[in-house]
Amino acid sequence: MPESTPSLPDWLSRGMADLFPAGDPTDADQALAARLAQAEKEGRPLRVKLGIDPTGSNIHLGHSILFRKLRAFQDAGHTAVLIIGDFTARIGDPTGKCATRVQLSKEDVAANASTYLRQLGQDQPKETALLDFETPGRLEVRYNSEWLEGMDLPAVIGLLGTGTVGQMLAKDDFSKRYGSGTPIALHEFLYPLLQGYDSVAVNADVELGGTDQKFNVAMGRDLQRHFNKGTQFGLLLPILVGLDGVQKMSKSLGNVVGLEEDPLSMYSKLEKVGDGAINDYVTLLTDLDLATLPENPREKQKAMALAVTASRHGMEAAQKAQLDAASLVGGAGDAATEVPGASLAEVNFPAKAFYLLSAVGICASSSEARRQIKGGAVRLEGEKIGDPNQEFASAAELEGKVLQLGKKTFRRLTA
């Protein structure tokens, strides 16, 4: 009998937006499935690369979808190769940027890298860690300064010779900047080549990336071919929209959920995700089966929020957060109607958070309000207020919301 055509397992294809090599997607699926089967037959785990440039200090759920896929490969017995771009971070990825990025110092990059590894679970049990740091052979953490910092000028010139200016200008970000007359520094053309060379250095079988990284991932495949290495597959995942359900999740847009947020803040934010984004959140951030979830969007939100919070903090903490949100600050159910009211009639807007707390009588003074906010004791609708100077434009923005101090003081704000 002829052998059956191999197909990708569900854990791998879930949420996948694109797969290299280019051409018929079915062929790419079958080729990767065949490589998986061959690796299993040979007892050789695939080497799955994910590169991150530590240009900031915090990871949010939008970033986490790539790490979740990398963890899925680990759990299937393959080797995750996490590349910390400590060298490339000093150049800065030009993807999505309309101007040259500010270059970071070695010290800044090292500090950010340490923070990233902690957030990914370096010191956590693997049950709640994003990556498995515990199981031998499942994770390699590499720094691309290992092979890039020692490159001499002939090697750099040789690397530059593998690409063309036409290729670089075909990259959407460069094309837009060139067309608008915005300067493009020559070192920025190096970035895709250096990131691509990472795949050569670590002998990657698969590289993960967001759909905005298609050019860079393809460059890695091209360079592997140039250096006579086995060519990698490029597996691309979608860009997660933020809490507004419209724009991509981004700290600068204020629509993020951070990995280190406490359970109540995380749950409270997630259960307010727009209806149009719920299915993507379920698919990309959980292992839940959409077909088994309630059709009611509100119930689906709750199930998603519980699952995501549990994946970071454990089910017990997630269930407590769900109960706290429902009974104290969720705005639904009998308990919510028992929260005492606080009038905004005498509040002068725009109002800063510290002033608001004292104006509605939750804190005795502005100085106490500042202290409580800085201590992490203040929440609005379950979401922690961290900045005493956070500003609210009008009473309409706060109408009906619950302001919380500590574990026992709650006030529903009324205009």
Curated annotation (Swiss-Prot):
Protein EC: 6.1.1.1
A Pfam family recorded for this sequence: SYY_C-terminal
Record GO biological process: tyrosyl-tRNA aminoacylation
Oligomer status and interactors: Homodimer.
One cellular component term from this protein's GO annotations in UniProt: cytosol
Gene Ontology MF terms in the entry: ATP binding; RNA binding; tyrosine-tRNA ligase activity
Residues binding ATP, per UniProt: K251
Span(s) of short sequence motif 'KMSKS' region: 248-252
Domain S4 RNA-binding: start-end pairs: 351-415
Top-rank EC class of the record's enzyme: ligase
Organism from which the protein derives: Parasynechococcus marenigrum (strain WH8102)
Protein family according to the UniProt entry: Belongs to the class-I aminoacyl-tRNA synthetase family. TyrS type 2 subfamily.
Function: Catalyzes the attachment of tyrosine to tRNA(Tyr) in a two-step reaction: tyrosine is first activated by ATP to form Tyr-AMP and then transferred to the acceptor end of tRNA(Tyr).
Listed name of the protein: Tyrosine--tRNA ligase
Catalyzed reactions per annotation: tRNA(Tyr) + L-tyrosine + ATP = L-tyrosyl-tRNA(Tyr) + AMP + diphosphate + H(+)
NCBIfam families registered for this protein in UniProt: tyrS
Keyword tags: Aminoacyl-tRNA synthetase, ATP-binding, Cytoplasm, Ligase, Nucleotide-binding, Protein biosynthesis, RNA-binding
Location relative to the cell: Cytoplasm
Principal location class: cytoplasm
Extent of motif 'HIGH' region: 54-63
